[in-house]
Structures are given as structure tokens and as C-alpha cells.
């Protein structure tokens, strides 16, 4: 399970990058369907996540990150391996 600090950091990135209300950023929220992100938004979001958390997300993994929960799970898995 992701730490509250990790969730808060991710939530801030999503709010800043996508210009959405913080209340909309829930684990089940789809970046494209619920938060209205387009493909450019997603690229910028992934880049911001990489920078904030010090991880590199390959394109094939980035394509699988569709929801807030997906992003948290990815970060949890890949930060613990460092």
C-alpha cells in the first residue's frame, strides 16, 4: 500500500499538471476518462512523476498507467526496488 506522503505528492502533481480539483483525484479516477487528460497531458504527467519520484518509467509501462491507482502501484513497486 502506498504511503500517505506518496499519495499526497502524486495528487499534487496531478492537480498541477491537469488543472483538476483535488477532490477528483481518487484512486479509481482514469486520467483520460475522468480527469480529461489528452495524450500530451499524459506524457507531461509521466515526466513530472519521474522527476518528483526519481524513477524512470519506460514507454511500455507508461501506457499501462491509466488510473491514479495504477500510478501509485507502479511507484510503490519501483521505488522499493531501488
Curated annotation (Swiss-Prot):
4'-phosphopantetheine is transferred from CoA to a specific serine of apo-ACP by AcpS. This modification is essential for activity because fatty acids are bound in thioester linkage to the sulfhydryl of the prosthetic group. The modification O-(pantetheine 4'-phosphoryl)serine is found at residue 39. The keyword Lipid biosynthesis applies. Pathway: Lipid metabolism; fatty acid biosynthesis. It is found in: Cytoplasm. One of its GO terms (biological process) is lipid A biosynthetic process. Its main location: cytoplasm. One of its GO terms (molecular function) is acyl carrier activity. It comes from the Bacteria. InterPro entries: ACP (IPR003231), ACP-like_sf (IPR036736), PP-bd_ACP (IPR009081), Ppantetheine_attach_site (IPR006162). Keywords: Cytoplasm, Fatty acid biosynthesis, Fatty acid metabolism, Lipid biosynthesis, Lipid metabolism, Phosphopantetheine, Phosphoprotein. GO terms for cellular component: cytosol; membrane. The keyword Lipid metabolism applies. It holds the Pfam family PP-binding. Residues 4-79 form the Carrier domain. Belongs to the acyl carrier protein (ACP) family. Carrier of the growing fatty acid chain in fatty acid biosynthesis. This is Acyl carrier protein. It comes from Chloroflexus aggregans (strain MD-66 / DSM 9485). The lineage of its organism: Bacteria, Bacillati, Chloroflexota, Chloroflexia, Chloroflexales. The gene is acpP.
Amino acid at each position: 500500500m502506498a504511503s500517505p506522503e506518496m499519495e499526497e505528492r502524486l495528487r499534487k502533481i496531478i492537480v498541477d499538471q491537469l488543472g483538476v480539483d483535488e477532490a477528483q483525484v481518487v484512486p479509481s479516477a482514469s486520467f483520460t476518462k475522468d480527469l480529461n487528460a489528452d495524450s500530451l497531458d499524459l506524457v507531461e504527467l509521466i515526466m513530472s512523476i519521474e522527476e518528483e519520484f526519481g524513477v524512470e518509467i519506460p514507454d511500455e509501462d507508461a501506457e499501462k498507467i491509466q488510473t491514479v491507482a495504477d500510478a501509485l502501484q507502479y511507484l510503490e513497486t519501483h521505488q522499493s526496488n531501488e
